[in-house]
């Protein structure tokens, strides 16, 4: 990758997506150059990876784990701070020597700004109730999702904490969504 940067492809499931950010952070920390090839989604990217059309891709553990279990790909590392349940034998980037490598995609229930407080609170309570069920937590854990019981204020704090680092990575890597 250092000697022939334009020949090594790093595929993501779209420009500006979490997989693009993970790939750029890897390139930055490894000190290598690769050609970013953004796909229009995970499925076509995974199809090309399995088919041998691309040598390297960044995807979610949810998409990658079944392919690895089927012997079609090899997952090299996960970008979370700890190993994930659906790929328990796969090391983290930190375990491989990439310190401070903590970049995970997270999902949140969002609503329009100005949502009445009573409606917002009812949604938060309903989500917390659903996420607290053992069956829901186990189903999510099996596919590599860690459930965080965070109130809206913690979500806002997470966004405010992570956004500056993501903006800095965009600048450092010269990322573009074009």
Please report, for each region that a protein language model flagged, where it lies by residue:
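Hinge/capping helix and adjacent helix->loop/strand transition within the periplasmic-binding protein
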Residues: 1-44, 93, 106-139
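Alpha-to-beta junction loops
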Residues: 4-7, 30-32, 50-59, 72-75, ...
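Extracytoplasmic
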Residues: 5, 73, 104-106, 142, ...
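Generic preference for hydrophobic
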Residues: 10, 36, 58, 75-76, ...
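Short helices/loops that flank or line small-molecule/ion binding pockets
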Residues: 25, 29, 43-53, 62-70, ...
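An extracytoplasmic/periplasmic, membrane-proximal ligand-sensing/linker region
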Residues: 28-32, 69, 95, 117-178
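Short beta-strand and adjacent tight-turn residues that come in two discontinuous sequence segments
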Residues: 39, 58-59, 78, 103, ...
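C-terminal lobe and pocket-closing loops
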Residues: 64-132, 164
